[in-house]
């Protein structure tokens, strides 16, 4: 703590001090609220809504509203909000993050701002990390809201469309982050307004905000449909991947090394970079692949699919581990969430990786998916008018919360002092010695009836420790992705005297561990971490399971020099020093240098992960602006707006585009290329083709005016063919939706291809993000033009006897939350994409749009 903080207090302490007068005001209203009958207390909700209509603000109502909720909590649940919980509620209402220790009652805190903000009638979303917590909180905390006359809903994974709509229409809705994001995307794919389930995004309270906005923000939400590709190539690549030999690289290839022409000496058929989770074929490996598939050059454009799929197969075998990244259950590959250790049913890795794992595990290979809609959590949650968050650990990522989400973090003091003892890390040379030490520590604690919670990173480790404890005769519970259903029950019993629980990562987060009297007298819950996580914050979350509400407790991490964190990110020099010390077997190593190395390794990874998330956001910001325009256009169509004016504007714009492209007043009309003009415009708008006679002696604008008049007249004739004007209006909406959806889905793929290729701009000393923005702008304009032209082409050529029905462009087959690292590489097109402002490939020296681009439009 610096001198300023010692004198004036930390920023959080100053913020809490500023809020205290409000807390005192809420406290002072307590006697008045106690005097009210249940009916009078409920009547306060109607009174608050009326006062809002008369011009008062939520801030004006806050002290009374919080006092009402506090009294309702006491009457309904027998739980009265502590002063520190009132502080937390105020922070959440202000759109900030309240860092509250485990066991401080974050769930109860959320009832305060959710009630206050629900009074506006626009809906409040309380966001949790899984269905169990959403359902539990809706049932328990929802009683307070219902007692006060508000409606409460919950959205669960298996709910139908009408059930979701009813839940979102409630005053307070409990929902998981994934369901919320996917419902937003699905709402922007519906073809009738009645199919929408969500209202506008007004205010949300995010529980475990660090898990949702930081940990899960590295990968976007993706809704996918099935592509028509065969699965045979995955099987062939899987067979080949098992025949290839893993080698080593002399050093890592960096961009600077590539520019300087440094050579990397590689052995074997492929090398694996575990840090960045990337697999690369060596020259020897490339030759083997070419021989296997009987092709001349793997790098040829027509072989991109083979190149992509063999890389996926190698990743599946060398970087994706069974019972760590995924489990096999009922002939299916199920993803395990890397942050919680929970199974994510229905989620599939994107870009063919899931199919590669299916081939590896010899289960039925499902067809590859095509991205239909996608959004990042950063951009989704930034759509809310206001958002607040709660967690036990946020200060380490405060800068990211402020920079990306414009939310600052305020540490809320605990209701009772924390008396948990956090011991120094116990470090061993090998994993075997480390696990022996963990088992000895569990046996020792168990002997004195002290409950133990052992945190592991992988399912494999939890099962190994389980076997070792069985040999020692220690009765215990295992909580990992395989036993998901029993999660809450097992966690709630973990504080009983003599209980031993092994939990993968933060499984069971959100469920309180309460101690019995015997356990409390035996020094409380003992937390044992079997490995340091990549993030210090997740280590702190594990520690925070012990010592709730002033309970006693202990924590210690057990580490070996063979752990992934030390092996991949620790200093090699340091590792060599300790290896050469000749430490006796099972002897614990203690050294300040080692503690610093662990801390530095974690900081390195945190910085790296922040870079990944920031990079994702920089690129997705461009996509987000385009997505906003497209979704706004779709919503106007869904709202049943009269599209006649929009169609007329498309007619004018299309005529303008081709007149300006083909004609010039600087050139005599006799020299105009009428064949080119007729070839591009008449397939879209069936006007009479222009002839030398019809343009003779006329200026460009005169031609323009005549063409527009004729095009509008033709459209009016088309209108007259319909018995009812509304029939054509509905047809316009049907055609527009079809064209928007079809072109937007192709555009998503094009943008991903562009993003993967744009990284090469860095070699030319150009900023890849700037290059991406410029190219994306051209592509978007090209897509808009294409939507307009396809819409007009279909409307001008439609026949009245055709039945008008809306239909989805592509069928949704699933959702995807890809937690795999490494860049996503979409299906490549064989032809090279040429953008409007690129030099024309024919070599004329003109821009593509002014040369061959014209002809291709036809």
Describe the residue ranges of each PLM region:
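Extended, charged helical/alpha-beta scaffold domains that provide interaction surfaces
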Residues: 326-334, 340-348, 549-550, 557, ...
């Amino acid at each position: 703590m610096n001198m300023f903080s010692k004198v004036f207090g930390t920023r959080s302490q100053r913020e809490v001090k500023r809020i205290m007068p409000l807390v005192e005001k809420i406290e002072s209203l307590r006697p008045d609220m106690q005097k009210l009958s249940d009916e009078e207390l409920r009547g306060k909700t109607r009174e608050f809504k009326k006062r809002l209509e008369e011009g008062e603000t939520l801030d004006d109502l806050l002290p009374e509203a919080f006092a009402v909720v506090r009294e309702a909590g006491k009457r309904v649940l027998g739980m009265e909000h502590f002063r520190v919980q009132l502080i937390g509620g105020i922070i959440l209402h202000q759109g900030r993050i309240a860092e509250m220790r485990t066991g401080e009652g974050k769930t109860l805190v959320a009832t305060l701002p959710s009630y206050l903000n629900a009074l506006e009638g626009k809906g409040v979303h309380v966001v949790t990390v899984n269905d169990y917590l959403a359902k539990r909180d809706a049932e328990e905390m929802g009683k307070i809201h219902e007692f006060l006359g508000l409606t409460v809903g919950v959205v669960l994974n298996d709910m139908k469309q009408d059930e979701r709509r009813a839940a979102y229409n409630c005053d307070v809705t409990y929902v998981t982050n994934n369901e919320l994001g996917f419902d937003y995307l699905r709402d922007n794919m519906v073809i009738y307004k009645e199919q929408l389930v969500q209202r506008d995004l007004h205010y949300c309270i995010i529980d475990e905000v660090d898990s949702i906005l930081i940990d899960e923000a590295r990968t976007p939400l993706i809704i996918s449909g099935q592509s028509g590709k065969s699965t045979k190539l995955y099987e062939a690549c899987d067979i080949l991947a098992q025949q290839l030999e893993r080698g080593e690289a002399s050093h890592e290839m960096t961009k600077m090394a590539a520019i300087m022409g440094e050579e990397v000496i590689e052995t074997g058929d492929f090398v694996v970079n575990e840090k960045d989770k990337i697999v690369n074929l060596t020259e020897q490996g490339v030759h083997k692949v070419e021989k296997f598939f009987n092709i001349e050059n793997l790098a040829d454009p027509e072989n991109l699919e083979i190149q992509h799929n063999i890389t996926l197969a190698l990743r599946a075998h060398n970087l994706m581990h069974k019972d760590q990244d995924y489990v096999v259950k009922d002939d299916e590959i199920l993803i395990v969430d890397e942050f919680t250790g929970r199974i994510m049913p229905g989620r599939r890795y994107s870009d063919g990786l899931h199919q590669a794992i299916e081939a590896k595990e010899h289960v039925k290979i499902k067809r590859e998916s095509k991205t239909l809609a996608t959004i990042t959590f950063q951009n989704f949650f930034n759509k809310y008018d206001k958002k607040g968050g709660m967690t036990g650990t946020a200060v380490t990522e405060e800068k990211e919360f402020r920079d990306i989400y414009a939310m600052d973090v305020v540490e809320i003091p605990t209701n009772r002092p924390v008396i948990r003892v956090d011991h120094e890390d116990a470090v061993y040379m090998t994993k075997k010695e480390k696990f022996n030490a963990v088992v000895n520590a569990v046996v020792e604690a168990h002997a004195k009836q002290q409950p133990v919670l052992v945190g592991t990173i992988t399912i494999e480790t939890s099962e190994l420790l389980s076997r070792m404890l069985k040999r020692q005769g220690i009765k215990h519970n295992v909580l990992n992705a395989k036993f998901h259903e029993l999660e809450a029950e097992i966690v709630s019993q973990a504080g009983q005297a003599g209980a031993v629980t092994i939990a993968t990562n933060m499984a069971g987060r959100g469920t309180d561990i309460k101690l019995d009297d015997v356990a409390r007298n035996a020094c409380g819950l003992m937390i044992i971490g079997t490995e340091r996580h990549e993030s210090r914050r997740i280590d702190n979350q594990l520690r925070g399971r012990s010592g709730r509400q002033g309970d006693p407790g202990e924590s210690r991490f057990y580490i070996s020099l063979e752990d992934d964190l030390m092996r991949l990110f620790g200093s090699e020099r340091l590792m060599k020093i300790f290896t050469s010390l000749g430490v006796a077997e099972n002897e614990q190593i203690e050294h300040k240098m080692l503690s610093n190395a662990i801390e530095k390794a974690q900081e390195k990874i945190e910085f790296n992960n922040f870079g990944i998330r920031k990079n994702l956001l920089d690129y997705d910001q461009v996509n987000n602006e385009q997505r906003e325009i497209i979704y706004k256009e779709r919503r106007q169509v869904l709202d049943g707006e009269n599209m006649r004016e929009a169609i007329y504007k498309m007619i004018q714009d299309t005529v303008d585009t081709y007149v300006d492209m083909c004609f010039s007043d600087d050139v005599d009309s006799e020299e105009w290329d009428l064949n080119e003009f007729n070839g591009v415009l008449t397939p879209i708008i069936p006007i009479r083709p222009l002839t030398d006679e019809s343009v003779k002696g006329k200026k460009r604008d005169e031609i323009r005016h005549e063409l527009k008049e004729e095009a509008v007249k033709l459209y009016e004739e088309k209108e007259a063919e319909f018995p009812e004007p509304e029939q054509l209006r509905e047809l316009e909406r049907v055609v527009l939706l079809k064209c928007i959806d079809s072109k937007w889905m192709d555009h998503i793929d094009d943008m991903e291809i562009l993003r993967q290729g744009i990284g090469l701009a860095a070699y030319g000393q150009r900023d890849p993000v700037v290059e991406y923005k410029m190219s994306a702008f051209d592509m978007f304009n090209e897509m808009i033009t294409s939507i307009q032209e396809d819409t007009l082409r279909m409307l001008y050529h439609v026949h009245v006897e055709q039945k008008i029905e809306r239909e989805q462009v592509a069928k949704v087959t699933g959702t995807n939350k890809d937690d795999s690292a490494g860049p996503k590489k979409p299906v490549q097109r064989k032809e090279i994409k040429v953008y409007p402002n690129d030099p024309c490939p024919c070599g004329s020296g003109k821009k593509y749009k002014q040369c061959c681009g014209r002809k291709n439009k036809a």
